[in-house]
């Protein structure tokens, strides 16, 4: 799943990049 991949890179990317999660 895509959200699973985002959760994995969430530790690498800054919180400001959370907009890409949409």
From Swiss-Prot:
<keyword id="KW-0378">Hydrolase</keyword>
<keyword id="KW-0479">Metal-binding</keyword>
<dbReference type="GO" id="GO:0005576">
    <property type="term" value="C:extracellular region"/>
</dbReference>
<keyword id="KW-0964">Secreted</keyword>
<comment type="similarity">
    <text>Belongs to the phospholipase A2 family.</text>
</comment>
<dbReference type="GO" id="GO:0016042">
    <property type="term" value="P:lipid catabolic process"/>
</dbReference>
<dbReference type="GO" id="GO:0004623">
    <property type="term" value="F:phospholipase A2 activity"/>
</dbReference>
<keyword id="KW-0442">Lipid degradation</keyword>
<protein>
    <recommendedName>
        <fullName>Phospholipase A2</fullName>
        <ecNumber>3.1.1.4</ecNumber>
    </recommendedName>
</protein>
<comment type="function">
    <text>PA2 catalyzes the calcium-dependent hydrolysis of the 2-acyl groups in 3-sn-phosphoglycerides.</text>
</comment>
<keyword id="KW-0106">Calcium</keyword>
<dbReference type="GO" id="GO:0005509">
    <property type="term" value="F:calcium ion binding"/>
</dbReference>
<keyword id="KW-0443">Lipid metabolism</keyword>
């Amino acid at each position: 799943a895509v959200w699973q991949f985002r959760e994995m890179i969430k530790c690498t990317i800054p919180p400001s990049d959370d907009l890409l999660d949409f």
